[in-house]
Structures are given as structure tokens and as C-alpha cells.
Amino acid sequence: MRRILSRVRAAVSDYGMIKDGDKIAVGVSGGKDSLMLLKVLCELKRFHSEKFELVAITLDMRFNGKDGDFSEIKKMCDEYGVEYVVKPTDLYEIISNIRKEPSPCSLCSRMRRGILHDTAKELGCNKIALGHHLDDAAETFMMNLLIESRIGCFAPVTYLSRKDITMIRPLVYVRER
């Protein structure tokens, strides 16, 4: 954990990811990357020179019309003293039954991102933290190079002017292992 925290501190410092007074929405899917991100940001909050707030947000895709069970994430957030919001969506219904997308991943990703941005803004957040790590960056770089014949990757910090919110990726120096 110390190694991960050290790398997150370095990324936060190198890219100026967190400023005093930030309210950061942490996108929490329930997977290992987003849960590690939440844990590490809670640890960082304890001793970071800049004071900031965290809110964990999960988008409930409502697979087959059923609400998801996020009780374990809720329990974790309660232990860390982090506000937890589950945002119900109809994404599964829209993509699977209404749009009948043959390759839904790209559309679903964009729609999830939009809902996450809107939810974060509704909660008064000025930043959104995502769990993309170093291996994700390398994979994105290679996919862009091989599929689109371009050199590029996501930025560790991205300001979205249309939404007036900043995306941060504090795990960008952390290997997946």
C-alpha cells in the first residue's frame, strides 16, 4: 500500500491534480481499480497539505431491470467516512433493447461518462477521479497506435470546458499487478 500511495502522491504533485477546497467525485464501479483509488484517496486525504472532500459515485446500470447490490461499497464508504451516492440509470435498457447496439462498448462508455459528469456537478464537485492506471495508459497508447495510426493517450488531468469539471487519474503512475 505504501508503494501505491507514494506513486499516487507523486502523480498528484507532478500534475497538480488536487487543490485546496476541491470536492472530488470518485467513480466507483466496484472493481479493484476504483476501490483501490477510493482507498488511496482516503489515505491521501489524511495527511495531504491541500484539504479536499471526496464523494463516491456508482452508476447502477440496472441490468435486466434490477437494481444492483452495492452494500459492500456502501459499507466501505461508511468505514472511510465518505459520502456514497448510487445513481440509477437506464443505460442497459437503452443500449440493449432500445438502440440494439451490436457493439455497445463505446456508446455505453460515453453515456456513463456523461451521467457521471452530470451527477458530480449536481453534488457540487469540481473534479472527478477515475481509476485508470499505468497499464491502462500503455494499452490506450498501443490501441491508438495500432488501430488509429496515431500517437496518443488519455491525459492524467483533463479539463472539460463544456461541463466545467476536471477529470483526474491519480493512479496513472501505478502498475496494475
Positions of predicted regions on the chain:
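ATP-dependent adenylation/nucleotidyltransferase module used to activate substrates
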Residues: M1-M143, I147-R150, A155-P156
